[in-house]
Regions:
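Conserved functional hotspot residues at active sites or interaction interfaces
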Residues: 1-67, 71-180
Length: 180
């Protein structure tokens, strides 16, 4: 997803999560602190192999969708793609929008150590969303360090933002987590 602090929202701006089941009878649940629009009015849907569903969420008051959890309640396989329609890389920008799409990986494929390098944008960092690292915890209570700093702890679904101070950074943790 694109994350824009102080975003100027437009009616078409939205986040989405697309799920395709790889098995019959797959009960998919969306767990989020934010309000999502779902095809059946609820946050749970059952899909058969090859069937898919799209959840969408419109932007309101710069609220982001990071930390949203999508899972199979009966532990069946699925493919998940998520993204943002109308993301912006500059704060308070009403034009120059873009689309961001990510193919998610299973928690078992997440690592415990990441090397992160800063983007090489030609723009000044003032007001642009470059050089930001998002840490999203996937299981239980996870402790991590960012760039050798103090140990920080987040619970499942927790999200924290860090700025890269102009050089490569390293993240390590006690459990699996995603760096976005």
């Amino acid at each position: 997803h694109f994350y824009s602090q102080n975003k100027n929202s437009k009616p078409g701006d939205q986040d989405f999560i697309s799920v395709m089941s790889l098995e019959d009878g797959n009960t998919i649940t969306l767990d989020s602190q934010r309000a999502w629009h779902t095809p059946y009015g609820g946050n749970t849907v059952t899909l058969d192999e090859g069937e898919s569903v799209i959840f969408k969420r419109s932007w309101t008051n710069s609220n982001h969708s990071l930390g949203t959890r999508i899972y199979s309640t009966n532990d069946k396989e699925m493919v998940v793609t998520s993204g943002s329609w109308g993301g912006r890389l500059k704060d308070n920008e009403s034009s120059a929008q873009d689309i961001g799409i990510e193919q998610l990986v299973p928690v078992k494929a997440l690592g415990k150590k990441y090397l992160i390098s800063q983007s090489k944008t030609p723009n000044s960092t003032s007001g642009y969303r470059q050089g930001i690292v998002v840490v999203a915890v996937e299981e239980g209570s996870t402790s991590y360090t960012f760039n050798g700093g103090a140990t920080q702890t987040l619970n499942k679904g927790g999200v924290r933002f860090h700025s890269i101070p102009g050089f490569n950074s390293t993240n390590t943790s006690s459990g699996p987590y995603a760096v976005i």
